[in-house]
């Protein structure tokens, strides 16, 4: 799967904002910015547009990013727990070692997005549209991945314990490196999913089959 990375200027050419230095203005659009160590919980940033930006070690818990747009953006070691990103758009975005516990991404659009080393337990991606999205080394325990509309989705070494996959088309998706203990799923949802022999036996038990 080809993933286009975020296209961002060198940091020396970005406009820097920080918690202890220059604070970002109250604007609707931000382009070519580095947000370093900002602490802005519960901030109202709905419908804002961010292009060519880096968020580094920012505390963005409970922030309202409803209908916000992110193009060519990197989130690096940020805390987005309980952030509301419903119907937001993410295009060429990387989440690196971030926390997205209980983040709301209902009906969001994710295109060319990577999540690497993220803690995203209870994240809600219900009815999200995913196009070339890769989850690597992520904790997705009890995540809601219901009714996903996905094209080219990959999971590598992720923990999906008790995650909900109802009405999520998993055909052709390789889950052999992932933990699938107690996932919530229907038989049609499993059709075409690639699993290991051990995983196949565990999934059979979830569906009420007796394996001898």
What residues fall within each predicted segment?
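Tandem repeat scaffolds
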Residues: 2-212
């Amino acid at each position: 799967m080809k993933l286009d990375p975020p296209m961002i200027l060198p940091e020396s050419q970005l406009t820097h904002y920080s918690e202890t230095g220059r604070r970002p203005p109250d604007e609707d659009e931000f382009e070519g910015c580095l947000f370093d160590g900002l602490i802005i919980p519960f901030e109202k940033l709905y419908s804002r547009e961010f292009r060519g930006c880096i968020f580094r070690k920012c505390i963005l818990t409970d922030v309202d990013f409803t209908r916000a747009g992110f193009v060519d953006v990197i989130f690096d070691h940020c805390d987005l727990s309980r952030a509301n990103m419903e119907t937001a758009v993410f295009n060429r975005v990387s989440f690196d070692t971030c926390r997205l516990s209980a983040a709301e991404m209902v009906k969001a659009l994710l295109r060319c997005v990577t999540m690497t080393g993220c803690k995203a337990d209870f994240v809600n991606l219900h009815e999200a549209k995913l196009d070339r999205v890769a989850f690597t080394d992520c904790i997705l325990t009890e995540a809601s991945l219901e009714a996903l509309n996905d094209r080219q989705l990959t999971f590598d070494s992720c923990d999906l314990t008790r995650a909900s996959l109802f009405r999520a088309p998993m055909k052709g998706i390789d889950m052999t490196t992932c933990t699938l203990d107690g996932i919530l799923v229907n038989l049609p949802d499993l059709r075409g999913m690639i699993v290991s022999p051990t995983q196949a036996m565990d999934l059979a038990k979830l569906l009420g089959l007796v394996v001898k």
